[in-house]
Swiss-Prot record:
Lineage per the UniProt record: Eukaryota, Fungi, Dikarya, Ascomycota, Pezizomycotina
SUPFAM superfamilies membership: Pectin lyase-like
Reaction equations catalysed: Eliminative cleavage of (1->4)-alpha-D-galacturonan methyl ester to give oligosaccharides with 4-deoxy-6-O-methyl-alpha-D-galact-4-enuronosyl groups at their non-reducing ends
The family this protein is said to belong to: Belongs to the polysaccharide lyase 1 family.
Full protein name: Pectin lyase A
Enzyme class, broadest EC rank: lyase
Gene name, Swiss-Prot/TrEMBL: pelA
PANTHER family: PECTATE LYASE 18-RELATED (PTHR31683), PECTIN LYASE A-RELATED (PTHR31683:SF16)
InterPro entries: Pec_lyase, Pectin_lyas_fold, Pectin_lyase_fold/virulence, PEL
Signal sequence coordinates: 1-20
Alphabetically ordered keywords of this record: Carbohydrate metabolism, Cell wall biogenesis/degradation, Disulfide bond, Lyase, Polysaccharide degradation, Secreted, Signal
Residues at the active site: R256
Length: 379
């Protein structure tokens, strides 16, 4: 009897652990159907070397982070001459002279000495068929980002935080980099105190990507706008990309939130932009942006001029009826508080949504409260 009781307790404990590390929900939008590591037995890395190995091997894996993996000082530091194109005040970011960027593009900027952590400059390689998931709020990668490139596909990143990547130094590293990938779901991820981009999709095709329920925290001691508001938020620049952004909290930024160009179809739905010191969207040539059901609170300029791509900003109930033809439903109005205008209504590109997996949309009325409380590594 006692043996049976102990076995039952052990079984219950194992079941509880399994439940705690399983993926929550499923991807909406363009990355619908992504499975990551699927039913692979979960592994719990204990060291940064084990984490790098698990993420970079060729096995389907479910990788559970149950603590902070701190890469700071793991690859040494570099001291060299950089530049200060935004000024030398204590709150200003300065730039590493990566690929002679200072020399070629900022020749008149003051030269400054920079000392940065080498680990941050290039993210951890993540190969195909991986689920990377945090256990509660414990899963943190500090001082180094994630890098998915060169054909990687079928990846889920959920309920983790990526923090403290050379925050003083532009070109010091990105939190999440995608370039030439397909079927990637970034969900309930917090990014904070990042050198450059919180999320960047490079110039090669990134195909089907969903970014959901994530917290882009732009609050920092250093910024390119020298005001504590991070400029380098989200950059979508792929040559054939379909990106769903849903339920994200984009906070305390000053630009590129997101910057969209290349050949990118973006569906931005039920996101909450809050407390921006300048502008949110930059919509360049080759951008096709549908924005609906979002909330913009204290965003002085919602979209920077000029808008060179195409934008349907869901400006009115009558205008939004056109969405029924292409999305199978009307689009939701956006909500604004102490923010600039956002009313462009290009419609020719909406046909690009036909036959695609489209995220659902709720009214903006409940977005601010629900997103602010649930976005990021809160599972």
């Amino acid at each position: 009897m006692k043996t049976t009781f102990l076995v039952s307790l052990a079984t219950a404990a194992l079941s509880s652990t399994a439940a705690a590390v399983s993926v929550s929900g499923s991807a909406e939008g363009f990355a619908k159907g992504v499975t990551g590591g699927g039913s692979a037995t979960a592994v719990y890395p204990d060291t940064i070397d084990e984490l790098v190995s698990y993420l970079g091997d060729d096995e389907a894996r479910v990788i559970v982070l149950s603590k902070t993996f701190d890469f700071t000082d793991s690859e040494g530091t570099t001291t060299e001459t950089g530049c200060a194109p935004w000024g030398t005040d204590a709150a200003c970011q300065v730039a590493i002279n990566q690929n002679d960027w200072c020399t070629n593009y900022q020749p008149d900027a003051p030269s400054v000495s920079v000392t940065y952590d080498n680990a941050g400059t290039l993210g951890i390689t993540v190969n195909s068929d991986k689920t990377l998931i945090g256990e509660g709020s414990a899963g943190v990668i500090k001082g180094k980002g994630l890098r998915l490139v060169s054909g990687t596909s079928n990846v889920i990143i959920q309920n983790i935080a990526i923090t403290d990547i050379n925050p003083k130094y532009v070109w010091g590293g990105d939190a999440i980099t995608l370039n030439d990938v397909d079927m990637v779901w970034i969900d309930h991820v917090t990014t904070a105190r990042i050198a450059r981009q919180h999320i960047v999709l490079g110039t090669e095709a990134d195909n089907r990507v969903t970014i959901s329920n994530s917290f882009i925290n732009g609050e920092s001691d250093y910024s390119a706008t020298c005001d504590g508001y991070h400029y380098w938020g989200i950059y979508l620049d792929g040559s054939s990309d379909m990106v769903t952004m849903k339920g994200n909290y984009i906070y305390h930024t000053s630009g590129r939130s997101p910057k969209v160009q290349g050949n990118t179809l973006l569906h931005a739905v039920n996101n909450y932009w809050h407390d921006n010191s300048d502008h949110a969207f930059e919509i360049g040539e080759g951008a096709y942006v549908l924005a609906e059901g979002n909330v913009f609170q204290n965003i002085p300029t919602v979209a920077e001029d000029p808008i060179e791509g195409e934008l349907f900003a869901s400006p009115s109930e009558s205008a939004n009826e056109v969405c029924s033809t292409y999305l199978g439903r009307v689009c939701e109005l956006n909500g604004f508080g102490s923010s600039g205008t956002f009313n462009q209504a290009d419609t020719d590109f909406l046909s690009k949504f036909e036959g695609k997996n489209i995220a659902s949309a709720d009214s903006y009325s409940s977005v601010a409260s629900s997103v602010a409380s649930s976005a990021g590594n809160t599972l």
